Every structure is written in C-alpha cells, then in structure tokens.
Design a protein with these regions (language model features):
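Short, acidic, small-residue-rich periplasmic hinge/interaction motif at the N-terminus
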Residues: 37-56, 68, 81-83, 114-120, ...
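Short, acidic Ser/Thr/Gly-rich low-complexity loop/linker segments typical of extracellular
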Residues: 86-101
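Short acidic/polar hinge/loop motifs at secondary-structure boundaries
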Residues: 103-105, 182, 208-234
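N-terminal periplasmic accessory domains that precede
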Residues: 129-136, 144, 176-179, 214, ...
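Surface-exposed extracellular loop regions of Gram-negative outer-membrane beta-barrel proteins
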Residues: 248-263, 303, 307, 319, ...
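Face-selective signature of the C-terminal outer-membrane beta-barrel domain
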Residues: 332-358, 380-524, 545-552, 606-609, ...
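Outer-membrane beta-barrel signature, preferentially recognizing the C-terminal barrel domain
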Residues: 385, 487-490, 530-533, 561-615, ...
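Outer membrane beta-barrel strand-and-loop segments of large Gram-negative receptors
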Residues: 444-448, 492-494, 583, 589, ...
Length: 807
C-alpha cells in the first residue's frame, strides 16, 4: 500500500480545532475521494476546506489570487471553479473572501479557472500561481437584475458587535461620520459619540487610532468594509479606554494616482459652516505615498438663559441672558508613506500638522439681573472678547508590522507638540473689568509594542506601552485672582498580557495590564510634593462568550482607570463673569471604574445590560468662592465622588421591509451618587428612558433617504434633573457618474427646532438651571468626487493615545 498524506487548505486563518465538530465528516469524505484519486473542495459553513491527496511523488502547490472589478474594488463572494481543460472534470472550488482573495490546491498544470459573479461577465482563465482577475460589468445582465442593499445585522462574537457595511444600507449614508451614528448602541453624532453603558469610544481605522474625528467626515461610508464595536476592550488598550469602534476599509488594489475631493456647506439661521478637503494617493508596487490638505471655517451662534441661586450671608439670585458668536478657521496638512515589503511585512511614517487660519475670535454679550434677598441689586450689562492665536501643531507616527511564521509584531512610535495661546477681556457696563492671557505648551513622546502568537488552542498577545508628557501652563491676569506658572511632567510605563481561547461554541478571554504612573507638579518651578503622586495599578480583564446558530452571548469585566485632564488639574482661577469664577483642582486622584457587561444578539435583535461601580468619580460642581470676602461670587470647580454607580440595559432591533429598513434602539439607565461630603442635596434616582430610530429607504435610480430621530425622558438622578430632549434629522442623496464616483447629499438638521440643551443641578449652597440653543436647525449640502479609488495601506495604530486625549 502506498503511503499518502491528506493536505487541508482553508481560505481562513482559523485552526481546524475551532471546527472540530465538522472535521469527522470531512475526513470520511476525504477517504472516498482518496480512493478515486481526485482532490476536491468541501464547503463547511462559511469556510472552504480544500482536501488534496498527496503521494510522496506528488508536488503540492496552490494558487492564490484576487478578484476585482474594473475600478480595482475587491469582489467578495465571487464563485471560483477549477476544472480540467482536457476533460472539463471538476477539481476544486471556493468563493472569494471579503477582500476578494482566494486560495485553491493546484496539481494539474492544465487546469482552468471559471470566475463568475452576478452582474459581471464570467471569465475562464488558465491557472497561474498568483492571479489578479478583473471582472467586467455585464450591462445587459444588470438591466434585468435588481440588486438590493439589505439592512446589516449586528453579530456579537469574540467580544465585539460586528456589522457589515460594504454592500448594505449603511454604505449609502454618505460619510463614515454619518454611518457610525447608526451602528447599534451608538448615540450622538459629529465625533461626540457614546456607547450605551460605556461612554465615549476610541475610533480605529485599519488599526490606526483616529485622533481627529473630522477625518471621518472626509471618508466615504462606501469605503468601509465592516465596523466592530468593542464594549469592554482588552488589556492591550489603555486603562482609560472605555470602548472601541474598529473600522476596516475595503482594500482596493489599484495602482497609480488616486484621490478624492470633498466639499461641505451648511447654513443655520445665523451661522454658516464650510469645509473643503483634497486627498491624493500614489501607489506603485508595494509603495504608497499619500497626502491631504483641508480647510474649514465655522461660525457658531449660541443663546443661553441661566437662573442661579447662591445662599451665603444673603440669598443671591442671578438671571442671565447671553448670546455668543464664535468664528474659527483651521487648516490641516498631512503626508506620509507606507511600504509593503511583502504580504507579511510593512512599515511607514505619517506627519500631520494643523493651525488656525488667523486669529479665532469669540464675542459674547448680554445682561444679568442680580437680586439680593429678592430685591434688585444690579442690572449688569456684560460683554466679553476672547482670541486664540495661531500656532502650528506637529504630530509624527512611525510603525512597523511584520509576521514571522505564526507570530506578529506591531510597533508604533509617536511624537506630538503643540502650543495654545489665548487672551480674554471682560467689560461690565462698558468698563473693562478683567483681562487674562494664557499660554500652554505640550510635548509628548510615546511607544507601543504588541506581539501576538498562537498558544495551545488560542491566541496570546503581550507588549509594552510608554508615554512621556511635558506640559507648561502660564496664566497672567489683571488682578481679580493670582498669576499661575504651572509645569507638569508625567511618565506612564505599562506592560500587558492577554489570552483568548476558542473551544467549540465557547470563547474565553483574560488579560492583565500593569501601569506605573509618576507625576511631577511644579508651581513657579518649585516641586509640589503633595501634588506629585506615584501610582502602581493592576488592570484586569476577563470575558466569556457562547455562540450557537443565531444566538451569541458574552459577559465581560474590566477595571478602568481615568487620569484627570490637565485642564482639571490647573490651579489658576479663570474669570467667567463678575459673579462667577472657575478653576481646577491639582489634588484630583485617578478615577477607577469596575465595569460588568452582558452583550448578545439573536438574529436581527441585539441587547446589552451593564453595571458600573466608580471610585473617586470626577464631577463639575458649584460652591461659594469665598464666603468671608466675596459672599456673592460663585465658583465652578472640580470634585471627586468617593462612590457612585450607574447601570441599565438597551435593546436594538433592525428588521427589513422591502425598501424600508428601520433600526430602533430603546434603553433605560439609572445613576446614583452620594454627595453628602460636598453638602449637595440629591433629587432622586429615577429611570431615564431613551429612544432612537433610523429609517432608511433605498430607492431606484440611485436615490437614498434617511429620516432619524431621538428622544429622552425627564428624570431626576442624583443631584441633577434631565429634561425631555429630542432631535429629528433628514438626509437625501443621489449618486452620479460611473461607479457612483459623484455623490451629492442634502441634509436638514433639527427639523422641529427641539435640539436644546438643558442643565438643572444642585451645588453646595447653590442651584443652577440653564437652557441653551446653538443654532442647530440648519440645511447643508455635501459633495464628494472620487477617482481611481484606492485606500492607503497605512497600518500605524499610534502610541500614547490616552495622553493625547488628555492634552
């Protein structure tokens, strides 16, 4: 009997152990195939397993390739069939992966490939070791076939909700910025997103941290392959990372010059906003050289009305009506390169700089009625001016990513530098009352190393992250408080280890992160020992998940640590008005949060439930400035709450009804904090209900309509009260030219003029109610043109991301 060996080739990187339940029938079939001496391919679920009989004298080979359209866009799920050119006998077959790639066993040198996909002309080609196949559109076939975009269904697996974007209704939403707002359990828009139960997420694009969310306004939603929402990030993420949204771009394989032009204009009742951007990418072989230039001009118009009570030596009431105009302009430049040495190794560098276009101005005016013991004491006319001066900021990232066998090494190094300079002047009844000048200089150096390797039946990740920050803050004022010269040096050194294991329908994860944080706080270059702490923290993470058929469930735990922002730590006193000052607290300690989260989905329904217990939570609060010398002045400052908790649940449903594809999210949350140590009375712990609905309509002739809205209910929670708020938006877009190269979108925001912000809270011996409206009702038009579309292959993920956010 001859000695034989069975070769298994799969189009995924998953190990066979993960699908152990299906290996036995595959082996049984392979025996019968061996008897016939014919290699074959078995489709096992979504994985194509090629089984090939190999004798000692047979040379085992395989062919690899990618299937693209005429614009170099990958075509996923195209059918690939290999057959004998002489007898037309079937040899093997598969479908392409999401990036258009495929792999098949190859032993017959005379074999041919037949490649087919709906809407494209079928091609028959001779087999080669490496193939790049371009399918041409079949115009006649497209005229008789209607291709429908379906509503993507989120699937929870391995700790993340994964939603396919490419080819779904989400790809029609214009920009990645618009698309993110419609992901499950995401609320907010324009960079101000929150994950229900977790808070503000970090955004990653192809593994690279997105520092400026305006970048997502320049990225088309059609260029996104899929989005993953990680509600409880693992140990390799910084201790302050609340949640993560990972975006993966469609990999486009075109060569030569490509680019896109983007323009946006919107007009409110008072405020215009405009931005223009141009992006270019030149690709030759494995080298990408890219660059971008962008400019933006914004004018905001805000009206607010506040009522404040302060109870000290007397009862003081302040009734303030104020209007603020803010004019800003900004320019952005970036350039860089990425070089793929091979499919296994790449490196690159990116430089980015931005600056204000001239001075940016803010002008505020209004009046305040001051009552003392219900008697009018003063009617004050207030006018203030502030100015920010232009300074270039500089950011550099360099990275290396390489695979060595089954090991992966990813290294990032970052440098960041910026200067902020501003001035303020305030007039009361036309007389100059206060002036101040502020200058801040920031420097950051950071590195991060992540090594990933297989271990037993799972995957192990370990690495280090280092961050070194230097910040100087100079504050000079005209006499209402004291000058300040603060200098902060901080270093954070971290190491982490994480392991993920899949066994049958179960998956397990565990990780541990260690952080050593040292802070040196100087006032006038004199070290302040009490304000220069050293912290050593262990940050654990654990998760467990179950997947079977349409049901996916996971439970996770993580400890988060949040260091106060540098603004929170400032000791200088800012002049807000004649009767209100503001300052930070350099004695703030890091906030620690224990998070427990249950996630899951069944078919098109997803759900989350969460509980968070927080130690030393940061809180903005109001108290008397100085009862003895200034009993009528209110101070806005920072405090920590020793113990607090918030918890709740949410459900998301995304069915599909023909051209109408709705998406509904309903949530409830509770918040409790004991504020007795601050002498702040609480109002209650009522449930806060929120509802959000997106209605998407995919119409003929490349038209698309979106109508979305949200509303939250009244609720008294802890020391504050939430008032019922809501918003409605409308979008309509149409694609033009071949391959939808031109997209025009009309946007109507805050249709019902309900986008108000309300604030109602108790303070120490004080209470404040605020109503604010920022000219949100507006009409806008977005135009995007793309040519020879390719995406940069830059894979730098950045280091020191948490410190960049603090700066």
């Amino acid at each position: 009997m001859r000695r034989s060996q069975f070769i298994f080739i799969t189009n995924t990187k998953e190990t066979m152990d993960k699908r152990a339940s299906s290996i036995i029938p595959c082996l049984a079939l392979s025996i019968s195939l061996f008897a016939q001496s014919n290699p074959s391919t078995i489709v096992d679920g979504k994985t194509n397993i090629a089984i090939q009989d190999s004798t000692e004298t047979t040379k085992i080979e395989q062919i690899k390739g990618v299937v693209m359209d005429e614009q170099q866009n990958p075509i996923p799920f195209a059918n690939i069939v290999m057959s004998s050119s002489a007898t037309n006998t079937y040899i093997a077959g598969c479908v392409t992966a999401e990036d258009g790639s495929f792999v098949l066993p190859y032993s017959d040198k005379d074999a041919i490939l037949k490649v087919s996909y709906v809407g494209y002309t079928t091609q028959t080609l001779a087999c080669k070791p490496n193939m790049s196949i371009v399918l041409k559109s079949d115009v006649q076939l497209l005229n008789t076939v209607t291709i429908k975009s379906t509503r993507p269904k989120a699937k929870f697996k391995d700790g993340a909700f994964t939603t396919l974007v490419s080819g779904t209704i989400l790809a029609e939403l214009g920009t990645a910025n618009d698309m993110i707002s419609q992901l499950p359990f995401v609320s907010g828009d324009d960079g101000n997103w929150e994950i229900i139960g977790r808070g503000k997420p970090e955004i990653y694009l192809n593994g690279r941290k997105v520092e400026d969310t305006n970048e997502l306004k320049r990225l088309s939603a059609k260029d996104i392959l899929k989005a993953e929402i990680v509600t409880v990030p693992g140990a390799q993420y910084g201790s302050s990372t609340k949640a993560v949204i990972r975006l993966y771009a469609v990999r486009k394989r075109g060569q030569g010059l490509s680019g896109s032009l983007y323009s946006n204009y919107s007009q409110g009742h008072y405020s215009p906003q405009t931005s223009e951007h141009a992006q270019l990418n030149y690709r030759t072989g494995g080298l990408d050289i890219f660059g971008e230039v962008g400019m933006a001009y914004n004018r905001s118009h805000t009206k607010y009305h506040s009522e404040t009570q302060l109870n000290t030596t007397n009862n003081f009431d302040y009734n303030t009506r104020r209007t603020t105009n803010y004019n800003s302009g900004k320019i952005l430049l970036n350039t860089g390169f990425n070089y793929e040495i091979s499919e296994q190794q790449s490196f690159g560098m990116k430089y980015e700089t931005n600056n204000l276009i001239g001075n940016n101005y803010s002008h505020s005016w209004g009046e305040t009625d001051v009552l003392q013991d219900d008697i009018l004491k003063e009617n004050l006319s207030v006018e203030s001016f502030s100015k920010s001066k232009p300074h270039w900021s500089h950011s550099v990232n360099a990275y290396y990513n390489g695979n060595f066998g089954k090991w992966n090494i990813n290294f990032n190094a970052d440098y960041y530098n910026n200067v902020e300079q501003s001035s303020q002047s305030v007039l009361n009844d036309g007389i100059l009352d206060a002036e101040s000048n502020t200058k801040v200089k920031n420097n950051l150096y950071a590195t991060k190393l992540v090594v990933t390797a297989p271990l037993w039946k799972g995957k192990m990740s370990f690495g280090t992250e280092e961050m070194f920050t230097n910040r100087r803050n100079t504050f000079i004022q005209s006499g209402f408080s004291a000058d300040a010269f603060n200098h902060i040096k901080q270093s954070i050194v971290a190491g982490f280890l994480e392991y993920n294991l899949n066994i049958g329908s179960m998956n397990y994860g565990a990780g541990l992160r260690y952080e050593h944080q040292t802070t040196k706080y100087y006032e006038k270059e004199v070290l302040q020992t009490e304000q220069s702490p050293t912290y050593n923290d262990w940050i654990p993470f654990a998760s467990i998940g179950y997947s079977h058929n349409n049901l996916n469930v996971g439970f996770s735990y993580r400890l988060n640590k949040y260091s106060p922002s540098y603004t929170m730590l400032q000791s200088s006193t800012d002049y807000i008005s004649k009767y209100e000052y503001g300052c930070g607290d350099p004695h703030l300690k890091p906030q620690k949060q224990h998070s427990f989260m249950l996630n899951g989905n069944y078919k098109w329904v997803s759900f989350v439930a969460y509980y968070n217990y927080v130690r030393d939570m940061y809180m903005t609060w109001y108290k008397p400035y100085d009862v003895a010398t200034h009993p009528d002045i209110l101070l806005q400052t920072m405090a920590t709450v020793p113990r607090s908790s918030y918890y709740g649940a949410a459900i998301n449903a995304a069915p599909s009804f023909g051209i109408w594809q709705p998406d509904l999210t309903a949530s409830v949350n509770f918040y409790h904090a004991n504020l007795d140590h601050l002498n702040i009375p609480t109002m209650g712990n009522e449930p806060l209900f929120s509802f959000e609905m997106n209605n998407n309509f995919k119409l003929p002739h490349r038209w698309f309509i979106n109508l979305s809205g949200n509303v939250s209910t009244n609720a008294k929670q802890s020391a504050g009260r939430n008032k019922c708020m809501g918003n409605v938006q409308f979008r309509v877009s149409k694609n033009f030219l071949k391959n939808d190269a031109l997209k025009v979108m009309l946007v109507l925001r805050d249709l019902l003029h309900t986008g108000y912000y309300y604030f109602d809270a108790n303070g120490t011996q004080s209470h404040r109610k605020l109503t604010q409206y920022s000219d949100n009702q507006e009409i806008g038009i977005n135009v995007r043109y793309t040519f020879n579309a390719t995406n940069s292959k830059y894979k730098g993920s950045g280091a020191g991301n948490s410190e960049k956010q603090r700066l």
